[in-house]
Amino acid sequence: MEIIEADEQHIPAMQKIYAYHVLHGTASFETQPPDEGEMSARLKKIQEAGLLWLVVLHEGEVKGYCYLGRYRERFAYRHTLEDSIYIDPGFQKRGAGKALLRRAIDWAESHGYRQLIGNVGDSEN
């Protein structure tokens, strides 16, 4: 496995992974999967905010992704981020999510963030 920063070339694979989780789980809190254009806009928003979006690659293919977004916009939450992790259903239970989370935690700590919040919305995790 290789973990790298996400870019536009990863959008189609990330959209496919996310669409699966929207349609077959409850963790995303969305009911309709966003299209590639919306996924691209989300990636751009995270990157323009100076935050982190990673993909995990296996044999050159995107098998999951993780990003850190602002938890709340209020000033008191300025050191708090929320993590989101989505793994290809055929690649789960291989440590990809754990590896992404470790990298996200390390990045957050090195950038002065003090809290990382993850909401788990699916009891089958």
Labelled PLM ranges:
Residues G25, R94, H111-R114:
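Short coil/turn segments at alpha/beta junctions that flank glycine-rich nucleotide-binding fingerprints
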Residues K93-D106:
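Conserved acetyl-CoA-binding loop-helix of GNAT-fold acetyltransferases
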Residues P33-G90, L101-R102:
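Acetyl-CoA-dependent GNAT
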Residues Q92, G118-N125:
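Conserved beta-strand-loop-alpha-helix junction that forms the acyl-donor binding cleft
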Residues E2, S28, E82-Y86, I117-N119:
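Short aromatic/hydrophobic contact patches that present stacked aromatics
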Residues Q15, A19-L43:
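Conserved GNAT-fold acetyl-CoA-binding loop/helix
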Residues A108-G121:
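Conserved GNAT acetyl-CoA-binding A-motif
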